[in-house]
Amino acid sequence: MSRVTLSRYLIEQTRSNNTPADLRFLIEVVARACKEISHHVSKGALGGVLGSMGTENVQGEVQKKLDVISNDILLEANEWGGHLAGMASEEMDNAYQIPGKYPKGAYLLVFDPLDGSSNIDVNVSVGTIFSVLRCPNQYLSQNESLNEEAFLQPGTEQVAAGYAIYGPQTMLILTLGNGVKGFTLDRELGSFVLTHENIQVPATTAEFAINMSNQRHWEAPVQRYVGELLAGETGPLKKNYNMRWIASMVADVHRILTRGGLFMYPRDAREPSKPGKLRLMYEANPMSFIIEQAGGASTNGYDRILDIKPESLHQRVSVILGSKEEVERVTAYHKE
């Protein structure tokens, strides 16, 4: 039986589910960019790509060399194809305008070019997260300048989302709104090949992922829930739990997607003005879309992540996602 490549899968989606051809081409271009990023990541010290740039991004985070390299790869791969009206990235203050010499398309691409990049120097899995939105009609004119407002759409408006994880294997996880598929990079073929047909998050779990060093800063509902997890079979939940924390959202969510679990990055008291650490547009929204399409759930403790109307491009949000029953439990604690 012949293997199904990403290209074949997308063509079949165009035939059977009316996936627009432009969206198909866009996903293929993003996948090619991820292959190039994977190549740079795998070189490590041999490629001279480790270490920091000595600069900061809009979030005030130190930029790693690979952050900037990955960002440039995604921009250069996608700007000329005619599928996009604009792009936005964790590494850029403002929306990226498609140069006037290239045709504009109907979609917007939002991405975190290298999530978990603080782990690069210690050889821990990192990844690229992306989200695709339709561009509002008023910005589709070739001469119309794109601004931040075009991107400020709730996660329910995403037409596709995915991430590439650069680990022992390079994988691409993708949803077009009809389930979640996993593709593994076959380096001999140079193609992503379908290896995970219908990914589902188990409804219950015995694992959770959270940075326990921040426990003293959490709000009471999170303190209560994690306390119950730690109490194990002698506590109210009557079973033992294991904690896993990689400090790379892609790596933590990928584990939860494949074997169940709960990922939490809650609001804490150190910066009361900030509702969370993770960015809504290019981290929480695409990951929440993927998790929901796999049968899981995602909230900020009170509301469904995908229903939140963004107010700014780099807006932060608290995130609780994963196995549905556990997400519903901790969300209920917030509402008591």
From Swiss-Prot:
It catalyses: beta-D-fructose 1,6-bisphosphate + H2O = beta-D-fructose 6-phosphate + phosphate. Pathway: Carbohydrate biosynthesis; gluconeogenesis. One of its GO terms (cellular component) is cytosol. Its EC number is 3.1.3.11. Transmembrane segments: none annotated. GO terms for biological process: fructose 1,6-bisphosphate metabolic process; fructose 6-phosphate metabolic process; fructose metabolic process; gluconeogenesis; sucrose biosynthetic process. InterPro entries: FBPase_C_dom (IPR044015), FBPase_class-1 (IPR000146), FBPase_N (IPR033391), FBPtase (IPR028343). It is found in: Cytoplasm. SUPFAM superfamilies: Carbohydrate phosphatase (SSF56655). GO terms for molecular function: fructose 1,6-bisphosphate 1-phosphatase activity; magnesium ion binding. Mg(2+) 2 binds at D112, D115, E283. The keyword Translocase does not apply. Substrate binds at D115, G116, S117, S118, N211, K277. Its cofactor is Mg(2+). Binds 2 magnesium ions per subunit. Mg(2+) 1 binds at E90, D112, L114. NCBIfam families: PRK09293.1-1 (NF006778), PRK09293.1-3 (NF006779), PRK09293.1-4 (NF006780). Belongs to the FBPase class 1 family. PANTHER family: FRUCTOSE-1,6-BISPHOSPHATASE-RELATED, SEDOHEPTULOSE-1,7-BISPHOSPHATASE, CHLOROPLASTIC. Homotetramer. This is Fructose-1,6-bisphosphatase class 1. It comes from Pseudomonas putida (strain GB-1).
